[in-house]
Swiss-Prot record:
Name under which the protein is recorded: Imidazole glycerol phosphate synthase subunit HisH
Ranges of residues in domain Glutamine amidotransferase type-1: 3-202
Superkingdom of origin: Bacteria
GO BP terms, alphabetized: L-histidine biosynthetic process
Family annotation (Gene3D superfamilies): 3.40.50.880
A GO CC annotation given for this chain: cytoplasm
Primary localization class, coarse: cytoplasm
A matching Pfam family: GATase
Pathway participation: Amino-acid biosynthesis; L-histidine biosynthesis; L-histidine from 5-phospho-alpha-D-ribose 1-diphosphate: step 5/9
Localization, UniProt: Cytoplasm
Signal peptide: none
Length: 202
């Protein structure tokens, strides 16, 4: 069985992500041990909270360069919610901060007259073919909770949702690095399909 590490950097509910993979028959390890992460076949970067806190914690646990190194080595990486946002070059939550720089773009406040945070079920619109969306269709619904959104180039946009008048990247990716703004682990059967597709690419 492939070794998958859910990176523990004191951000978010890691157990719910672990349980979602277990329902697919895939065991995972929750760890911040550098050697364990280095030996992993794939990495999961969950996250709930603020961009600066996430980057501070990644730095505190000496994880920034290691994640960048594993990404450059072609190891599949899946970022979820805040974990997706820190994959980008820069974030503007509370203060301007550098991200991991694995994807092009920035993380900015959602600019809409709708209620913030964007919370609840919303539809996906598929922007381009990708192994990540192999089992998905337009209008599939997934669960979001966020106040900030990524901006990214079209070639890294896999699926998006709309909230009011705003187009929000929902699945982004380049090569072995994938991010989901929504929570697959809270998105029922559709979320299960996203994680299943990710596992099949490892």
């Amino acid at each position: 069985m492939k070794k998958i590490v859910i990176i523990d950097y004191n951000i978010g509910n890691l157990q719910s992500v672990q349980a979602a993979f277990l329902r697919l028959g895939q065991e995972t390890v929750i760890s911040r041990d550098l050697e364990e992460i280095r030996k992993a076949d794939a990495l999961i970067l969950p996250g709930v909270g603020a961009f600066p806190t996430a980057m501070n914690n990644l730095k505190k646990f000496n994880l920034i360069e290691l994640i960048q190194e594993r990404a450059a080595a072609g190891i599949p990486i899946l970022g979820i919610c805040l974990g997706m946002q820190v994959l980008f070059e820069k974030g503007y939550e509370i203060e301007e901060r550098q991200g991991l720089g694995l994807l092009k773009g920035e993380v900015i406040p959602i600019k809409t007259n709708e209620k913030i945070p964007h919370m609840g079920w919303n539809q996906l619109n598929l922007a381009k073919a990708s192994p990540t969306t192999h089992y998905l269709s337009d209008n599939d619904e997934v669960y979001f909770v966020h106040s900030y959104q990524a901006t990214c180039p079209d070639d890294e946009l896999i699926a998006y949702t709309t909230y009011g008048e705003v187009k929000i990247p929902a699945i982004v990716g380049k090569n072995n690095v994938i991010g989901c703004q929504f929570h697959p682990e809270k998105s029922g059967e559709i979320g299960r399909k996203v994680l299943k597709a990710f596992l099949e690419e490892i």
